[in-house]
Each structure stands twice: as C-alpha cells, then as structure tokens.
Swiss-Prot record, chain A:
Effect of S428F: In allele Ddc-R33
Active site: H227
Family: Belongs to the group II decarboxylase family.
Subunit structure: Homodimer.
Organism: Drosophila melanogaster (Fruit fly)
Tissue-by-tissue expression: Hypoderm isoform is expressed only in hypodermal epithelium and the CNS isoform only in central nervous system. Expressed in the adult head (at protein level).
Superkingdom, natural source: Eukaryota
Key word Lyase present: yes
Disruption-associated phenotype: Simultaneous knockdown of Ddc and myc restores increased dopamine levels and the induced male-male courtship observed in the single myc knockdown.
Binding site for substrate: T117, H227
Protein name in the entry: Aromatic-L-amino-acid decarboxylase
CDD domains per the UniProt record, alphabetical: DOPA_deC_like
Length: 510, 637
C-alpha cells in the first residue's frame, strides 16, 4: 500500500508556514553578470579556431626554435594582474606579440627533438568539450560517463595492441586500464603497488621485521638505458634502484637475473623491475621475453614502460617486440606521444589494481571481492584525487581516424626515419650510433664527441631544425626523431640538407 | 580532419558548448544510470575505419550526456566549485593547439616564463609575502602549477622528507636510511583533506592526525604537545600540513598559533593547504584569514576551484625553491639545454616530468575578468551562502553546523544521523539537487556549497524549497514510526561509538607504537637491528615495538596488515566518508545488502517506498525555466 503523498496545505507547527523561503530577493545586490556572454565567447572562439587552424597549417614557416633568452617575457607584460577586465581582442593580439616569440614549435616538421607529442584536431575539439562539461571524475558517481568511457576506451586500446585478456576490464577479472597524466606517474604508481605487495609478502614470512627494516632491503631494477623517470620513481618511493648493464643498449634476462641473485646473496629483497620497450636514447627494446620470466621466477613486479613505442604495437608487424607481455604485472604507453592524442594521455594497465588501490589510498575497499571493472573509483589508481575527462579525446581520435589511419601514421613515420638513415649512411662523414628503430635515427659525425657537440650547436643555432643529443657509454650522438604529423618526404630531405650544410660549414672552418 | 573541417567542427563544438551551458538547468543534476551503463552502448573495439563526425556528436548527446554528473548545474551543491569559464576553455584550446611540453625552459620558453609571471600575479593578488614570489628582488621562492592539491601536498612532503633525512644522516652517518625514515612524523588535523594521508603513505612516513577544537580548527597548543611528546619518544617531527578552508566544514586551522609553536621546532616544514579558500584572499576583506602565512614554507590554492579556471590548475608557492627541487632532480642529458643555469626548469618542481601549457588559461581568466571581476564573483557566492544560512536558521527544525565564512554551509535536521542520511539520500536520488555529507564534530552533516558560476538568489531559494519539501515528507513519515526511532537511536549509538573509537585511535600515539608508555622514561638502546654497527656515534633513542598482529605497526599500509580485521576496516571507512557521495544506484544498494562483508552502510537500509514516492512526483519547474518561458513569451510580442 503506497503512502499518501504529503500535501503542502497540511499545517505545521512552524510559525512561518512550511519553512519555505520568505527572504526578499531584493535583499541581494542586483545581479551583475561578470561572465563572458555566449555571443562574445563564440566570436572569441571562432577567432581562436581560425588562429589554431592557421598556426598549424602554416607552421613550417615559423622558426622552429625561438631566439629569445631567459627572462624575455617579463618586460612584455605587466607584473601584476589587471584590476579591470580586458577585451578578448587584446588577449588575442598578445598571442602573437607575447607568446609566439617564446614558443618552441613542437609540431613543426623541423622539430626532431625528444619524441613526438601528439596533436590533432579531433583531440583539440574533444578537449574543448571536456573543458565545457568540466566534471571532476574522482568517483563513479562524480560523473559516470567520465569513468565508464575511460574503462571502455582502455579496453579498445588494449585490444588494438592485443594485450593479454588479463589486462582488460572486459575479461571480468581483476585487471583494467586507467589514463594517467604521464608515464612518470605510471612508473611511480606501479612501483608503489609493487612495494605494497612485497612488503606484505615479506611481513608474512618475517613477522618480526618492521616495515622500515624491510624497506631498507627493497631493491628495484631497470636498464642503464631506462628513462630518467624510473630513477626518479625510486627516489620518490624511497627505495634503491639498480641499473642493469645493457648489451647493445638492451637489457637481457641473464644480466637481470645476475643482478637479482647478487642482491639476494647480500640479503636484499628484489621487488620491482622496469622493462623498457623503446628507450629514449636510442629506442632500444629490452628483452621482455627474457626479463619477464626472470622477474616472475624471483617474484618481482614487472612493469613495462613503452611510453613512445607502445603506439606502434597497433601495427601487427611490430608486435613481436612485445613478446613476453603476458609476464608483466603492469604496462604503460603514451597515446599522447605518437597516436595523435593531445597531451595529457598516458595509458596504463594493471593485472591486479588492488595492490595499487591499497598501496597509498586512505579509503579502503568495502568488499573483498575481485573488482569487476565496470565502475572503478579511479582516484585510487592515481596520485592526484581529481581527474579530467581525458577519455573523450581518445574516443574522438580513435573514431575519427579509425585504426587503419593510425597504423598508416605510424608506418609513415617509420619510413621517414629509414629515409633519413639512408641519407646518413650514404654520406661517408657520418655513421649510425645505434640501430634505427621506429621513428628515431641516432647518428653522428665520425670522430670525437667534441665535433658532434659543435655540430649540434651549429644545427640548432641556425634555427631551421631542432635536435637534441644523447650519450651512451661516453659516445655522444644526435637524435633525429620524427615528430610532426605534417612531416613529408621533402621535409626529411630538407632536414638532411641542414645537417649536411652544418657539417660543411665546420669543415670549411678547419 | 583537415583544417577546413576543423574550423567548421570547432565552431559546431562552440555552439554545442554554448547550448549545453545555457540549457543546463533543464537536465537532471545527477544521472540515473547504473554502473556499467556505457559498456553496452559502445562497441567493444575501436573502429577500423574512420567514423563520421556527426555520428560522434550524436553519441555525445545520446550516450555520454546520460552519464554525466553536471558539475556546472545550478543545482549542483556538492564538493567545491569546479572552475569553468569561456576564457579558460579557450586558453586550454590554445594550449592544445600549440601542443608544446614544458619540462624545461628551452622546451618552450613562453610556457615556463608565462607560468612564472602569472604565478607572481596571482600570489600578489592573494597577498602572499614577497618571499614566495619568484621575480621579487632577493627572493628564493616561486610558484608552479600542479595538477591538483594532492600533488602540492605530496611534493612538499617529499621535499621535507628529503631535507629531514639529509639532516638526520649528517647526525647519524652510520644508520641505515630505512631506520631514519621510521623516525619521521608528520602532522595534520582530523579535518585535513585525505590527500595528506595519501601523501604520507606514498612518502612512507608516519602521520599523526590531531584533534581540532570545537570549531574544527587545529590549535597551536595541540601541535606543540604532540610534537614534544613525539620528540621525547625519539621521533622526529618534520612536516605539518595546515588547512585554510577544510573540505568538511570550511574551517580554518589557527595558523598564527601553529606558526609560533613551530619556531620551537626548527627544521619542521609548514605547509598551508588552502585549495578552495585561498582563492578568496584576492578580496581585501578576507585577507585576515591568511594571517600567519609568513610562517609557512609552502602554500597551495586551486584556481580550478573558485577562480573560474578549468581543472587542472593547482598553484603552489614555496619559500625556498632549491629545497623543493633538490628532492626531485633527476637530470639526463637529453633534457639539458644551454640556458639550464639561468632559467627555471619546472620539471624539477613536480612528480611528472612533462607538463601542459596550463598557464595560458590562468592568464586568459585573470585578464578577461580582471581582479575586480573575480572579487565580485567570490563575494556573490559568499552572499548566496549567507542567504542559504539565513533560510536554515529560520527553520527551527534545522541547525547550522559550521561558521559560514565563505561559500560552504553545513547544516542538518535536528535529530539523528540516520535521519539526516535519509534526507540527503532522498534528495540526491531525486536528481533535483546534489549535495554530499561530511562528518564534523562526530555528527553527520549535509554540505551545501554555492558552486554554479551564474547562481542566483532564486536558485538558492529553490534549493531550500526542495530541501524543505523532502524534509516535510520525511518528518511526516518518521512521526508514524516510533519503533523505528528506538532502533535508530540504538544504531546511532553504535555508530557514534565506532566513530569515536576510531577518532581516538588515529590520534593516539599508541597506534604508531603500542609500547609507548607515557608514565615511563624513554629507554636508551645501544642495539640496532641494522647490520651497520653504530660504534662511535651517539646512541639513537629507540623504543621496542611489540609484535602484536592486532596492533598497527605504522600508518603506511596499515590496511594491508589489518585487512583481516573487518571491524577496523569498517571504522576506517567512516573516517573518509565525506569524500564519497551518498548517491547509491538501486542495484548497488541491493547488491550491497547481499554483500558478504559487513559494513555500517548495510545497517543503514534505504526505504524503497520512499523511492517509489519520489518517482511519482512531477518535476518541479525551476526559476530559470520560468524565466526562460517568460523570455519566450516576450519574444512572441
């Protein structure tokens, strides 16, 4: 029998009726809008859309590297915020006057430093929508679409790479994926999960040891070629991290095992190893099919860092480099590097997220059952509490390009790298410092490190192309990374001519 | 998508955004979907072929929007504001378009330099002392944008830890670092944000959670007594996190008192977390709330909360940037550049190495609104909160549970916690309003926050009308259920005891070391479990830790070691409930009831008949809808 709905006319004891508002609206100041109204936003937005389209369309014409010196910006703008609102037209004008002179143009076809940072129109537009919805998705209910789109997008992405089902939420097991801001955060989160897991294991074996005694014995491993964020994760996590000597820039299982056995003999407790697929220096690939089983044998957490190269695994021809992935406990790559998704979008999968959830979160799970992955509280899978609606840009990019066009994008960059490598080899003054992998060419002038430092300085000083150096075992070389989605074959010819011209200049000066 | 299509689709998105924000009041605040709703709406794999843009936009409305909790809705009163404004959206759009990654100055000079300058702009507007501003003559400080306040607390705690360990190693060169780490103690109020606890777990240090006063404010004497006691036990205080504007009740720790007391403990890092309230200090009349800031080593506030700036934009200032960066520096060759010594390189100031060009949106917002416009906006929210407070005070059935200083009002029906939990639940389930609870002074309270950018007095009145309607119905029902009341009282007592027990637990130093004996003198021990012999160095005061699997060895990872003790787990969950939402999808409620793990939540069953009643109610027209109808009528003339 349903309850009779209450009627507003039923009297109550309250002298002011049913307690409803009876304060006059006039008591407040008249409403003064301080907001930019929609029509103004549309004008500003249209100008911005046009600006962005023209900027990216004509980016070749800009000098890739700015000529400014540190402190250039301060004299150009006031030293305090304006008291009164400014016109949007003035803000727009300052973009060219103030900002652009100091921008390093990462999307210029002449930018060959670091690794690509992706940029595409679908991602830009999706981020606009994310900004408008402006929800903060730290729990499922804080915005269900935010969480659930992320769950599905991580499964889409995992399938594109053919990750083992244990990593995917749709398998119904413990595993699942999460979008982090950067690979640095993924590496740290994995380390913290590994630490929690090992501490519990050791505590069960040695109840008399306190956790700080155990902490002092923990040791993690990575190749001497691993990214600096791995070393930093060890620093932040308060544990020792051993560098394992690589062979031809690649970490082998035997070397890892030797390091582990040596540490065990000294009474230390190995707990974590980072296997890198695509190192920053030379895009080398650790032997995951060797290191993974070694890690499993010694009960270490294996984290795979494929920040740049992971995008290439959407192409079947590169998946052999992932061999051994089933032995990993966590895997990370950055769609925001090479998959046309704007920064920040770092994809991370965990076979068992409960170790991460329990490692550093203060809101423990209510029920001790395997998470189904339908509605994870992602704030427990990451360091910050709040999170943006990043899955939107992944969703837009994957749908608007389709897998086939993303594959084509990857393959095109790999071909450009080969093209540049061929140009190097054809010039007897130059040599390759490492095998060409993916979109990276490592090259140098034959001879001393000093000559190559001078060459790089000259190349970058001309401002027409931008490279950065790397050093492996005291050999200094130049890194030519294929970065821009606007790059054409002609751009590679142009870049080679720049390198060659700089070398010519150096020869003439001798 | 080429640039021609981008221009077209970009403007279509602008239209969509304008339409979304203009008609937002017509949507339910919270979605009515259940967990897993989206999985069945989307294909399990990415499309092989490109899809049509129009199809994607249809999916945004048909599949995404049904699952969106509308944080910008005028009826969203949960948490704190999530900043959103047109200038901010466009600043982010430009940041995306430029697409540089600012880990070093050379990686894009404008990215670094605009951040330095804009942080000085904001620091000046707030009224921070000169030593926090990077470009002031002689300053060693500076500001940086982080993703969230959690990271501000974490990086400052990491820096404090590094500094403390360095000092301890100098004093005890032969002691293993793990043992030195076990001596470190951090402090915060019970009302502090959970990110302080999370940071302590990541840093692997002990955190002592202290009892605030009756106004939920942490006092200087409390800090002093705790630190003195810990020092006597051989522990090393190294970090204090204070809050200006707590999440639960917007309370303010007593910074002048705490700062003075810390003068007695050199080497302790004092951090001030003003994530929400810090924005309001751009108003001169609110600057007194910042009193004592000169004692602080670091300060953070989130423009992405109350300064109309989109997430992520959390600003952190430090007094001495070298102490921050030296804890975080890892410096490979490929990140070095010719100007490394002359420029600030922000990759050393945070956990991630890579970073977005976030300063653009802050720059756009500060210029588009001006300080005066932002001041007006903040004052408007405070007025709205005061208006709501007055409405609550006029109704004798309700009470106010905090000092309403800014935009947050904590209130409840007089009566049991269960009664208030029911009230919040039925309101949130209706989707007309969205609020969250908090625990303040061991009582369940409802948080009402003035959030929406264009909120009006009518919105406040309308929200109050909704609350009163639901309260009337609930109280009517309660009057006919005396037996239920008796049981409620019993359950309330049980919950109160559990909560009280837990609060005592987390503030009791015995949690950290059950062997602590306040009546006894500290024992000196020449023996260390470390294999390193400390011969020749000063003995370290160390107390024996008893082996007792039921006691908490240390705060970090405590849940792992006590995972078999479900009662404690349940108690712990109550501590942090204020961060969770009270909305429970129907299936979750039923599943939860059948769950194998007991939890206090299962004891607080929800009444299905109430839900049925709610479903029968017709949606109430909001004032904005009325105004829109009037506007339409006017247009016909």
């Amino acid at each position: 029998m349903s309850h009779i709905p209450i009627s507003n006319t039923i009297p109550t004891k309250q002298t002011d009726g049913n307690g409803k508002a009876n304060i006059s609206p006039d008591k407040l100041d008249p409403k003064v809008s301080i907001d930019m109204e929609a029509p103004e936003f549309k004008d500003f937005a249209k100008t911005m859309v046009d600006f962005i389209a023209e900027y990216l369309e004509n980016i070749r014409e800009r000098r890739v590297l700015p000529e400014v010196k540190p402190g250039y910006l301060k004299p150009l703008i006031p030293d305090a915020a304006p008291e009164k609102p400014e016109k949007w037209q003035d803000v727009m004008q300052d973009i060219e006057r103030v900002i652009m002179p100091g921008v390093t143009h990462w999307h210029s076809p002449k930018f060959h430093a670091y690794f690509p940072t992706a940029n595409s129109y679908p991602a830009i537009v999706a981020d606009m929508l994310s900004g408008a919805i402006a929800c903060i998705g730290f729990t499922w209910i804080a915005s269900p679409a935010c969480t659930e789109l992320e769950v599905v997008m991580m499964d889409w992405l995992g399938k594109m790479l053919e990750l083992p089902a244990e990593f995917l939420a749709c398998s119904g097991g413990k595993g699942g994926g999460v979008i982090q801001g950067t690979a640095s955060e993924s590496t740290l989160v994995a380390l913290l999960g590994a630490k929690a897991k090992k501490l519990k294991e050791v505590k069960e074996l040695h109840p008399e040891w306190d956790e700080h005694t155990i902490l002092g014995k923990l040791v993690g491993y990575c190749s001497d070629q691993a990214h600096s964020s791995v070393e930093r994760a060890g620093l932040l996590g308060g544990v020792k991290l051993r560098s394992v000597q690589s062979e031809n820039h690649r970490m082998r299982g035997a070397a890892l095992e030797k390091a582990i056995e040596q540490d065990v003999a000294e009474g230390l407790i190995p707990f974590y190893a980072v296997v890198t697929l695509g190192t920053t220096n030379s895009c080398a690939f650790d032997y995951l099919d060797e290191c993974g089983p070694v890690g499993n044998k010694h009960n270490l957490w294996i984290h795979v860092d494929a920040a740049y190269a992971g995008s290439a695994f959407i192409c079947p021809e590169y998946r052999h480099l992932m061999k051994g992935i089933e032995s990993a406990d966590s895997f990370n790559f950055n769609p925001h590097k090479w998959m046309l998704v704007n920064f920040d979008c770092s994809a991370m999968w965990l076979k068992d997220p409960s170790w991460v959830v329990n490692a550093f979160n203060v809101d423990p799970l209510y029920l001790k059952h395997d998470m189904q992955g339908s509605a994870p509280d992602y704030r427990h899978w990451q360091i910050p509490l709040g999170r943006r609606f990043r899955a939107l840009k992944l969703w837009f990019v994957l749908r608007l390009y389709g897998v086939e066009n993303l594959q084509a994008h990857i393959r095109r960059h790999c071909n450009f790298a080969k093209q540049f490598g061929d140009l190097c080899v054809a010039d007897s003054r130059f040599e390759l410092a490492a095998e060409i992998n993916m979109g990276l060419v490592c090259f140098r002038l034959k001879g001393s490190n000093e000559r190559n430092e001078a060459l790089l300085k000259r190349i970058n000083g001309r401002g027409h192309i931008h490279l950065v150096p790397a050093k492996i075992k005291d050999v200094y070389f130049l890194r030519m990374a294929i970065c821009s989605r606007f790059t054409q074959s002609e751009d590679m010819e142009y870049s080679w001519k720049e390198v060659s011209a700089a070398a010519d200049e150096m020869e003439q000066e001798q | 998508m080429d640039s021609t299509e981008f221009r077209k689709r970009g403007m279509e998105m602008v239209e969509y955004i304008c339409n979304y924000l203009e008609t937002l009041n017509e949507r339910r605040v919270t979605p009515s979907v259940e967990p897993g709703y989206l999985r069945h709406l989307l294909p399990p794999e990415a499309p092989q072929e490109p899809e049509d843009w129009d199809q994607i936009m249809r999916d945004v409305e048909d599949k995404i929007m049904p699952g969106v909790t509308h944080w910008q809705h005028p009826r969203f009163h949960a948490y704190f504001p999530a900043g959103n404004s047109f200038p901010s959206i466009l600043g982010d759009m430009l940041g995306d378009g430029i697409g540089c990654i600012g880990f070093s100055w050379a990686a894009s000079p404008a990215c670094t330099e605009l951040e330095t300058i804009v942080l000085d702009w904001l620091g000046k507007a707030i009224g921070l002392p000169d030593h926090f501003l990077a470009l002031k003559e002689g300053s060693t400080g500076g500001g940086v944008i982080q993703t969230s306040a959690s990271e501000c607390v974490l990086v400052t705690m990491l820096a404090a830890r590094a500094q403390a360990l360095k000092r301890l190693k100098a004093q005890h060169p032969f002691v293993e670092e793990g043992h030195l780490l076990s001596k470190l103690m951090a402090y915060c109020s019970k009302e502090a944000h959970s990110c302080v606890e999370k940071a302590a777990m990541i840093c692997f240090v002990k955190l002592r959670i202290l009892e605030p006063d009756d106004d939920a404010s942490l006092r200087g004497q409390t800090i002093y007594e705790a630190m003195e006691e810990d020092e006597l036990q051989g522990l090393v205080p190294f970090f204090v996190s204070t809050t200006l504007g707590t999440t639960g009740s917007c309370a303010f720790d007593n910074l002048p008192e705490i700062g003075k007391q810390l003068q007695r403990f050199p080497g302790v890092w004092l951090h001030v977390d003003a994530a929400y309230a810090g924005n309001s200090f751009i108003c001169p009349e609110l600057k007194p709330l910042l009193k004592g800031i000169e004692y602080a080593d670091s300060f953070n506030t989130n423009p992405n909360k109350w300064l109309l700036t989109n997430f992520d934009c959390s600003t952190l200032w430090v007094r001495d940037r070298i102490r921050l960066t030296s804890a975080l520096v890892v410096d490979p060759l490929y990140l070095k550049h010719g100007y490394s010594d002359a420029a600030i390189d922000y990759r050393h100031w945070g956990v991630p190495l890579s970073r977005r060009f976030r300063s653009l949106k802050l720059w756009f917002v500060l210029r588009s609104y001006g300080i005066s416009g932002l001041q007006h906006y903040i004052r408007h929210h405070i007025k709205l909160a005061k208006r709501f407070e007055e409405l609550v005070l006029k109704d004798k059935r309700f009470e106010i549970c905090n000092q309403v200083k800014l935009g947050l009002v904590c209130f409840r029906l007089k009566g049991s916690d269960k009664l208030n939990e029911k009230l919040l639940s039925i309101i949130n389930e209706s989707g007309k309003l969205h609020m969250v609870p908090a625990s303040v002074g061991d009582r369940y309270i409802i948080r009402f926050c003035a959030v929406a950018q264009n909120a009006t007095a009518e919105d406040i009145d309308y929200a109050w009308d909704i609350i009163v309607d639901f309260a009337n119905e609930l109280l009517e029902k309660e009057q006919h259920d005396e037996l239920s009341e008796i049981m409620n009282r019993k359950k309330q007592d049980t919950l109160a005891q559990k909560r009280s027990f837990f609060v005592r637990m987390v503030s009791d130093p015995k949690i950290y070391n059950p062997a602590i004996n306040k009546a006894g003198t500290p024992k000196l021990s020449m023996e260390l479990p470390s294999p390193v012999v400390s011969r020749g160095s000063a003995p370290i005061i160390r107390t024996q830790s008893s082996v007792d699997h039921n006691s908490w060895i240390s705060w970090p990872l405590a849940f792992l070691f006590n995972s078999n003790n479900e009662e404690k787990g349940s108690n712990v969950s109550l501590r942090f409930r204020h961060l969770d939402t009270n909305v429970r999808p129907s299936s979750s409620r039923r599943n939860s009831g059948a769950g194998s793990s007991p939890s206090p939540e299962n004891e607080l069953d929800y009444v299905n008949v109430q839900q049925q009643q709610m479903e029968q109610r017709s949606p109430r027209r909001s004032p904005m809808a009325v105004r829109k109808a009037s506007s339409t009528r006017d247009n016909l003339n």
